[in-house]
Amino acid sequence: MANEIVKEMIEAGVHFGHRTSLWNPKMAPYIFGKKNQIHILDIRETLRGLLRAKKYLSQVAAGGSLILFVGTKRQAGEAVEEQSLRCGMPFVSERWLGGTLTNFRTIRSRLGRLEELEALRAGDGINDYSKKMQSSLNREYRKMYRNLNGLRTMNRLPEVMFIVDPGKERNAVREAKRLGITTVALIDTDSDPSQIDLPIPGNDDGIRSVEMIMRELADAVIAGKGQTQTEAAPNAQAAPEAAAPAEQPAEEAAAASSEG
């Protein structure tokens, strides 16, 4: 099973990092080497991080926890939305609104407004307004739908948040840390892994890479939700500490770097 995942990761380019000039030194333990001024991630560390994250997300999902998936960059949005919907979890794929977590009550009230607008558009009520007002209401609806639609199922603060590229989503990470929400992230060579509870070192700019990681995590959530409450681990909501990187890089990583 692990060999199949490693093969899929290599095919998806999960091991490709950023240009060496953009690296964060704190990612050094997860880097195998460099090629053509591009850092190559140790695929074994990516596998370890992914399996650790899958186990944890499966456990918390089995315990009924909410997991918020966040990825607003162009390469991530579609996969984040698709896989979050598939596993029945809330998501943010367009824009992180300040206060999404720390001012959650306001976000819930805005969702109420979104539902009001939908009801207005679904019936004939909108025809009672002038053309100018209808246009204004439709613009308001489209903007709110784009930014808030993925949060409809988040009726409380999440216990866990998964982030694609925590460097870009630093505001989301900051809010999660402030509230004690466990963070899991796909993190590239230019980010700081010390800010994340469970880092998955990997390519966060490649569409295929993000799709592959999101699919694996969604599968884990679905599997966890299929368990009964009594089958869940007793301390499922306590995130395990990220294990120290292995001293020797994986053979698969060496092969991957030579293949380019």
Swiss-Prot record:
PROSITE patterns: RIBOSOMAL_S2_1 (PS00962)
GO molecular function, one term: structural constituent of ribosome
Manganese found in the keyword field: no
Gene3D superfamilies the record matches: Glucose-6-phosphate isomerase like protein, domain 1, Helix hairpin bin
One cellular-component annotation, GO: cytosolic small ribosomal subunit
Coiled coil spans: none
Keyword hit for Ribonucleoprotein: yes
Keywords from the named record: Ribonucleoprotein, Ribosomal protein
Pfam families for the chain: Ribosomal_S2
Any GO BP annotation: translation
Highest taxon of source: Bacteria
Family indicated by similarity: Belongs to the universal ribosomal protein uS2 family.
Protein name per the record: Small ribosomal subunit protein uS2
Native organism: Rhodopirellula baltica (strain DSM 10527 / NCIMB 13988 / SH1)
